[in-house]
Amino acid sequence: MNEFDRVRDYLTDLQDRICAAVEAADGKARFAEDLWKREEGGGGRTRILRDGAVFEQAGIGFSDVSGTRLPPSASAHRPELAGATWRACGVSLVFHPHNPYIPTTHMNVRYFRAERDGEVVAAWFGGGFDLTPFYPFDEDVQHWHRVAQALCEPFGQERYAAHKRWCDEYFFLRHRNETRGVGGLFFDDLGQDFERDFAYQRAVGDGFLDAYIPIVQRRKDTPYGEREREFQLYRRGRYVEFNLVYDRGTLFGLQSGGRAESILMSLPPRVRWEYGFTPEPGSAEARLADYLIPRDWLG
């Protein structure tokens, strides 16, 4: 089996396993599957769970797509690849819970290959996971980062620190001067050693459930009211802002003629904006700002 097919098989299995775990955690709703084809090449399967007991919407998509010309979002930082044919596969998910005390989360793992005249000229892995709480708890954030640190350990002492820092820098809303959440891991252009890099991608993909599901179980029965729900919807607006303004995956998908429904499944089903909103000083809502700056959660 060639390298691309090995990654592809892992990713389809990962999607299956995460769907099963989320359905078990939700206890009510099930994923609906949408199989799709891309005219330019490839296709995928998008799965959406809606209106569950725990999750308002949970989307997880697998795609395997190809093209004859790299879009600007992909070739901007690799100009030598302009005009190359390409193929990419990945799994991407975003989960939006009902309960404002359960954080929203995102995970993505992907593999990209570019060819010219039948020869592979570049291939790399990318991905990571990050957590976006609305009412954060130190124990949840520390658990999230402990899992991230542990899965990085076999790949060198600096791996966690480097990819945590990359995550903090990537998921940053410059126009708001705040991070999207409390971070996690982010990596891209990892293509020096296929076996080692593929092992790391698997560690990130497999570690996601260990990082997230315990937080869901801990917070899913926390009582909340209209105030918390309104704040959750307001903060979801920042999620939308990041995805539509900064996210490279969203831009790549749209610029490459990708399937808009699948690309935009990351957006929350309900969201609101409020001009000039300022949380009451000393409130739980105001406390969130203390978490939206890069910091060492395990120190």
Curated annotation (Swiss-Prot):
Q: Where is this region: Important for dimerization?
A: 239-274
**Record-annotated membrane-spanning stretches:** none
Where is this chain primarily localised? cytoplasm
Instruction: Enumerate the active-site residues.
Output: H106
Molecular function as annotated in GO: coproporphyrinogen oxidase activity; metal ion binding; protein homodimerization activity
Write down the top EC class of this protein. oxidoreductase
- Which GO cellular component terms are attached? cytoplasm
Q: Where is this site: Important for dimerization?
A: H175
The record's section on Gene3D superfamilies has: Coproporphyrinogen III oxidase, aerobic
> Which residues are noted in the entry as a divalent metal cation-binding?
H96, H106, H145, H175
Query: Which biological processes are named by the entry's GO terms?
Result: protoporphyrinogen IX biosynthetic process
Its name, as the record gives it, is Oxygen-dependent coproporphyrinogen-III oxidase
What organism is this sequence from?
Answer: Xanthomonas euvesicatoria pv. vesicatoria (strain 85-10) (Xanthomonas campestris pv. vesicatoria)
